Regions:
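Extracellular leucine-rich repeat
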Residues: 2-462
């Protein structure tokens, strides 16, 4: 007997001993006794056990009706056609396909495999199979699909009464609302059959996060979003501890832009961190300070609305913890610079402030402190070049960048300017007369010292 055959028989007994499947330690498909890529099979008649590497030749299908256990290692094709490959395997009870590059089951399993109880397709590149792939397997009780490339699963594929145990770990599953079937608690549901659902992990964009709590958050967000006129999306999540929903911090984005709203929404879904209200007709920002649903809002896009004042935010907790505030294109003419300055100094979260395209007042009362704020926090004010004086016909500063104004331009009005030059001329004339008088005094003193005579004007006075 050849060494290869002895080696293979040893592994047959290992497999029989672990009749419920392989462990990673002793999986026979990772111990190929054949050093080349030729198709080779061996059959243990006493156990009705057939194992094949690199494909299944037709010559072995002649013995198919006697095979109860079939192992296919290193399947050479990217597609696996169950209908064609398994035709004639009428006694098959257990099928394993492992350590292969197959990507697709191209057909459903044939009716001849109706007695198949244990199906294991593991460590392949399988990413898709028909929704009726297992519909003919009325005896199937154990389905192992671990360590494949499955991103989405059609839950209808698991709709068999006999099926009791499903394994799915090691697949890059997408965590979307389409995966909400995994939350179904009802007995007999597909979810109740997934043995390892607590170990399932999400793929992009929530790489490595636990699937169950993420899908639960997404499902809850979808339901709560129905109470608004907005679009809602889970942006990202971070783990705050063990992988349970209560220990995952979620960040959701709610987009209510261009909805013709006249006030901020009364209700927001849980975990709303980004709120977009662009292009509405909102005037009042009070809900940021009074409505508890806004507690988690960090990024607020309020551009192109009708906001005239942010005075309501002065001294509020929200102003001390916001991350982004966009007030471009509103009706602002001024703001409480001291309150905003204080918030920017003490808020370690703030990353962006947008104030451009508003009709800002440019006068000596408001603008100097506002200009100082803009220059001091130019790294946070992202649209500083668009922050300009109101566009008017009677102001020399009309539409000028506030950052670049001089104090003279800010604090001297046109009316004041008309009085400035006459007074200046008068001051110059008076100063000149003083210098002339002082010069005449010095001359007279010098003349007296030289001649001992008083100047003529002094004689006349005497």
């Amino acid at each position: 007997m050849s060494a290869q055959r002895i080696f293979l028989i040893v592994f047959f007994y290992i497999y029989i001993h672990f009749s419920h499947g392989f462990t990673e330690k002793d999986d026979i498909c990772w111990h190929d006794p054949y050093i080349n890529n030729y198709s080779k099979c061996s059959f243990m008649e006493s156990q009705q056990f057939l194992i094949c590497f690199n494909g299944l030749k037709d010559e072995w299908k002649a013995k198919a009706e006697n095979v109860q256990i079939l192992i296919l290692c290193k399947w050479p094709k990217v597609k696996f056609n169950p209908y064609d490959v398994l035709r004639g395997f009428t006694s098959l009870r257990k099928l394993t396909i492992a350590n292969s590059n197959l990507t697709q089951l191209s057909t459903a399993f044939p009716i001849e495999a109706q007695f198949l109880e244990n199906l294991k397709i593991t460590d392949t590149k399988l990413h898709t199979f028909p929704k009726d792939a297992f519909s003919n397997l009325r005896s199937l009780r154990y389905l192992d699909l671990r360590n494949n490339a499955l991103e989405e699963i059609n839950v209808k594929a698991f709709n068999m009464l006999a099926l009791k145990h499903i394994f799915l770990t090691g697949n890059p599953l997408r965590c979307t609302e389409d995966t909400a079937w995994i939350l179904d608690p009802n007995e007999g549901s597909a979810s109740s059959k997934v043995v390892d659902k607590d170990k399932l992990l999400c793929a992009t964009p929530y790489d490595g996060r636990p699937l169950l709590p993420i899908v639960e958050i997404i499902a809850t967000l979808k339901e709560e979003c129905k109470q608004t006129v907005c679009n809602c999306e889970l942006i990202y999540v971070i783990a705050a501890g063990m992988f349970t929903q209560k220990q995952i911090i979620a960040f959701a984005s709610v987009d209510c832009s261009h909805r013709n709203l006249t006030e901020m929404p009364i209700f927001l879904p849980a975990n709303t961190s980004t709120l977009r209200l662009t292009g509405n007709k909102i005037k009042d920002l009070t809900p940021l300070t009074t409505n508890p649903y806004y507690k988690s809002v960090q990024d607020l896009y309020m551009d192109d609305n009708l906001v005239e004042s942010i005075g309501r935010l002065e001294g509020s907790d929200w102003l001390d913890r916001f991350r982004l505030l966009n007030l471009r294109g509103n009706k602002l003419i001024d703001l409480p610079t001291y309150a905003l300055e204080n918030a920017l100094l003490h808020n370690s979260n703030v990353a962006g402030l947008y104030l451009g395209n508003n009709s800002w007042t440019c006068d000596c009362h408001f603008t100097p402190s506002f200009q100082d704020l803009l220059i001091r926090h130019s790294n946070l004010v992202k649209d500083i070049n668009d922050i300009r004086c109101a566009l008017t016909s009677d102001n020399d500063n009309s539409n000028k960048q506030i950052r670049d104004l001089t104090r003279t331009e800010i604090c001297i009005s046109v009316d004041e300017d008309s009085w400035f030059y006459p007074l200046d001329i008068l001051n110059i004339v008076l100063a000149s007369l003083i210098f002339l008088m002082f010069g005449k005094l010095l001359y007279d003193y010098w003349f007296f010292k030289k001649t001992g005579k008083l100047p003529s004007i002094s004689k006349n006075m005497c």
